[in-house]
Amino acid sequence: GGGDYSPDDVSRAVREGYLKTDADFLALGMKDGACMVTVVVTPTHIIASNAGDSRAILATEDGVVELTSDHKPGREDEQARIEALGGFVLELDVARVMGHLAVSRALGDADLKRFVIADPETTA
């Protein structure tokens, strides 16, 4: 059976799941982190969420559609967010948060948590 829910309801539930998992990782004392992607398919919508550089794509007869965008520190909006929080992005082999991490969103990564958020971006 199905419930009466909207893409916004699904997005909120997925976001809560990401943030709860992030908090659980941190509570365990985990220093490492993980990127995450989630795709929920309903009869009327495809709802894709991600944090980090895990990517969801949709293959159709006409080609491939990217459902998510990678969270890289060099992405203009991500770099602005990090800098607004007092952090920096350093270009080494690739753009890195505080010269270390090559993604700007992830679950865990306790040492950079101030700048590396678990809050997913969602498209529906």
Language-model segments: what does each one mean?
Residues 1-124:
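PP2C/PPM-type serine/threonine phosphatase catalytic domain
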